[in-house]
Swiss-Prot record:
Belongs to the cyclotide family. Bracelet subfamily. It comes from the Eukaryota. GO terms for biological process: defense response. Residues 10-71, 103-105 form a propeptide. The presence of a 'disulfide through disulfide knot' structurally defines this protein as a knottin. This is a cyclic peptide. Probably participates in a plant defense mechanism. It comes from Viola biflora (Yellow wood violet). Disulfide bonds join 76-92, 80-94, 85-99. This is Cyclotide vibi-J.
Length: 105
């Protein structure tokens, strides 16, 4: 079982993004004139792990509660440890390794 730990740790070296956030990004891009993602965004998106497990999404949300209380922000369903927020197209920015959208904006 000890040999499985490095592989498990490696899987957490990727950023995460929720299925819902990907859908929001695609809706926003679809409303643009050309409806295409740029090459940099496609590269970043393929470097992230899409999560759809509600337990993982809840863990991402709960890990950000202390920041939420201080900044008037809420998580965008994406981490930004290694790759910047793709959800910037929907108004999100990286703060403490999680992408947030200011609820006051």
């Amino acid at each position: 079982a000890a040999f499985a730990l490095p592989a498990l740790a490696t899987s957490f070296e990727k950023d995460f993004i929720t299925h819902e956030t990907v859908q929001e990004i695609l809706k926003k891009v679809g409303s643009n004139s050309n409806g295409m993602l740029d090459e940099q965004t496609i590269s970043a998106l393929t470097g992230k792990t899409i999560i759809s497990n509600p337990l993982l999404e809840e863990a991402l949300f709960k890990s950000s509660n202390s920041i939420n209380a201080l900044g008037g922000t809420f998580p965008c369903g994406e981490s930004c440890v290694w790759i910047p927020c793709i959800s910037k197209v929907i108004g999100c920015a990286c703060k403490s390794k999680v992408c947030y959208k200011n609820s006051l904006a």
